[in-house]
Every structure is written in structure tokens, then in C-alpha cells.
Amino acid sequence: MGKQTKLDFGFAKDKPELPTWVNGVPFVDEVETFNATFGKPNNYEPKIPEKKEWQFVYDFILEELEEYRQACENGDIVEVLDALCDIAYVSLGNGTMLHGLKDKIWPAYQEVQG
């Protein structure tokens, strides 16, 4: 993912109001809307898609993990947060909609972490 100009993610501002997510799952609704707007697939039944589809998500997560590692090594907390946000967006949003797990992710998370 291309880097933007210097980010501060609200570190220098008052705390932003937190959104309320549908089904308690951040990023999924945003990705669903993005996909619909730009003609990308939203799957609603659990599936393993073709390799070219899941390979994109896999490669994207690896890229963001590398950016996270570099940010930690550089002591750059803003870039750490940027990488963590990208990892969450891709994992929860893209991964969930790609695999048709929108209605399954939150109950599964609660069970695994509960």
C-alpha cells in the first residue's frame, strides 16, 4: 500500500469519536461498501476462492507485516499504527468478505478469545 504524507492519527488532537460498527466488527462494513462501489466481489457464503483472489490478501498482509517490523525497528510509532490499521483492514475486511465470513467472524472471534 502506498505511503501517504506524514500521518499523526489524532496523536496531536483530541480523541476522535469512535464509530459504532454493525455486528460489532470493524472494517468489514467499510470493505463491503468499497467492494460494491468498485465492482469487487463480496461473498456471503463461506468459501475458499481461487488462488489469485486469496493470494492478493495473503501478499498484502505480508507486505504490511514487513512495514510493521520496519516501523518498530525505526522507533516510528505513527508508522506502527499505520501498519497495524492496514493489517486489521486487510485481515478483517478483505479476508472476511473474500471468504464469505461476514456473519461468522464476530462469533468466531468471541469463541476463540473467550
Which ranges hold each PLM region?
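Flexible "arm" and connector segments at domain edges
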Residues: 2-114
